[in-house]
């Protein structure tokens, strides 16, 4: 019989998650404070339920991992990293289990990068019957928070480690918190509060395309909206570098006014 590790086991950490919701034997990572989700726009809540950039992290000498989760119709893969290196991906769409084998018996830091698309409720995992498991050492990497639209959410990427925030974080050695919300980057003050209240060494904000497409801010309110958002973040990050980015080039939008200008 394998050794079962409960989803709520405190030796498992959840880097990249803003909060975790525990129900029965499941843990669902959120990218907003889930207890306050009724305060957020419902469209944003839907995207925040997708664990882009969230990892389950632990240390073990197990040679196999069998994970359990809810079934979900449209969901990307789980990626396995060992000691920071990519090992394999597992399909999770319409599945309740995923498995990785032949991992060797050495003690290693394991990271399960969760799907950037689709709701994911973790229901625990099986490891080798005699394997040891402990909390991984504290990640001392610089902490990076990135906020943006679908450009940052990267729902079209093949797997969670092939999104551009994941590639940058792994290449540069950053501890990633991804707040990319497809179609929902509208300078919500509640998101500014989330960023404000989270530890960060670098913050990047990619702004504009959803505001243009959704016509949510006008020439009168766009600039003040950015300033207000940054001012909220600065309340607890007075000296943290903040990079303000425009979206990637978008033909058809560059010289065309929307309904609010």
What is each model feature region?
Residues 1-143:
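N-terminal secretory targeting modules
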Residues 43-46, 180-184:
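Short, flexible loop segments at the rims of nucleotide/cofactor-binding pockets, characterized by
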Residues 61-63, 172-174, 238:
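Short glycine/proline-enriched coil/turn segments at helix->beta-strand junctions
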Residues 86, 152, 184, 211, ...:
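Surface-exposed, flexible loop/turn segments at secondary-structure boundaries
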